[in-house]
């Protein structure tokens, strides 16, 4: 199979090229990313354990005091809730940063492939190439910002309608649902914009002003590619994430039993088991997400090639 980047490809060929490059160059990608994958797994384990154990426990305690015992929250529980919420926010932000840095290690190799049509296996196992980390993080954050602005605008509009216009709640719910779906659909070209920004020079909004329209004109190609690739990855994720999902459900059910007056039925080693499970799951997830990143890379190359040929025909 030919793995040249700039080539006109159908969505099937794009997906095939992305997965093909992943399997043929897995050792290269693993060697370039395994250290950051371990760091990602540690952050994922911390965030996952917090969501699976700590948050359900605090929520159950709050519900027990307010709904069962009909009491005001104790100061200790209120403080613990605020502290846990703060830790959750910090870990979420750290997760975004570490995820961007992790995939930057792969994007470095893709940048090398874009420029030279080949990739060199890293010489050392213990080394992290930091090039493109900052650019990848900015691509993440700016893309989120572009999505967040219309979301906040719609939320503000719904608030105004709710406060000053007599509309049925179902009307507002349907309006919010349609608006959210519209934003999600319009956000797909941002994948092309982000890839073009990360792998080339120029500021994000300078690239955005030129590339978003191009991405929008190829919306069907982007959507179909991401949909099919996403379905494949989601199935694999469902399989490999099953232990973490089962543990989370067990913790939640134990807290529900505690809320109903039953003793907490989780064994003493549950916390350690949850941490280890989420750590291993996080490490595996890096290499489950990676083929989708390579698919987006070839999707970007296919669009670029199409635009180059279109411009030549105009000349």
Give short role names for the model-derived ranges.
Residues 3, 7-42, 122-149, 188-239, ...:
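Interfacial aromatic "cap" segments that immediately flank transmembrane helices
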Residues 4-20, 24-27, 34-81, 85, ...:
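Generic N-terminal leader segments that precede the first folded domain
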Residues 75-92, 103, 107, 126-139, ...:
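A conserved helix-loop-strand patch within extracytoplasmic ligand-binding domains
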């Amino acid at each position: 199979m030919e793995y040249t980047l700039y080539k006109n490809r159908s969505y099937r060929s794009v997906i095939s090229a992305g997965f093909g490059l992943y399997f043929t160059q897995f050792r290269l990608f693993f060697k370039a990313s395994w250290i950051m994958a371990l760091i990602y797994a540690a952050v994922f384990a911390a965030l996952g354990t917090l969501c699976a154990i700590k948050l359900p426990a605090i929520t159950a305690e709050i519900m027990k005091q307010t709904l069962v015992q009909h009491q005001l929250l104790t100061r200790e529980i209120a403080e613990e809730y605020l502290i846990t919420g703060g830790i959750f926010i910090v870990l979420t932000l750290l997760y975004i940063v570490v995820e961007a840095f992790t995939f930057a290690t792969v994007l470095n190799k893709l940048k090398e492939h874009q420029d030279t049509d080949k990739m060199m296996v890293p010489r050392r196992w213990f080394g992290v190439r930091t090039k493109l980390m900052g650019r990848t993080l900015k691509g993440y954050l700016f893309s989120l910002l572009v999505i967040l602005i219309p979301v906040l605008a719609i939320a503000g509009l719904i608030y105004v309608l709710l406060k000053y216009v007599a509309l049925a709640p179902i009307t507002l719910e349907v309006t919010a649902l349609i608006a959210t779906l519209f934003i999600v659909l319009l956000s797909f070209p941002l994948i092309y914009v982000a890839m073009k920004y990360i792998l080339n020079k120029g500021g994000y909004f300078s690239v955005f002003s030129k590339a978003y329209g191009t991405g929008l004109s190829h919306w069907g190609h982007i959507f179909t590619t991401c949909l099919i690739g996403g379905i494949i990855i989601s199935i694999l994720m469902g399989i490999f994430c099953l232990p973490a999902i089962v543990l989370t459900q067990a913790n939640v059910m134990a807290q529900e039993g505690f809320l109903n007056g039953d003793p907490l039925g989780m064994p003493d080693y549950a916390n350690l088991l949850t941490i280890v499970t989420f750590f291993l799951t996080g490490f595996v997830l890096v290499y489950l997400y990676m083929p989708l990143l390579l698919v987006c890379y070839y999707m970007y190359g296919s669009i670029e090639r199409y635009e180059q040929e279109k411009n030549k025909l105009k000349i």
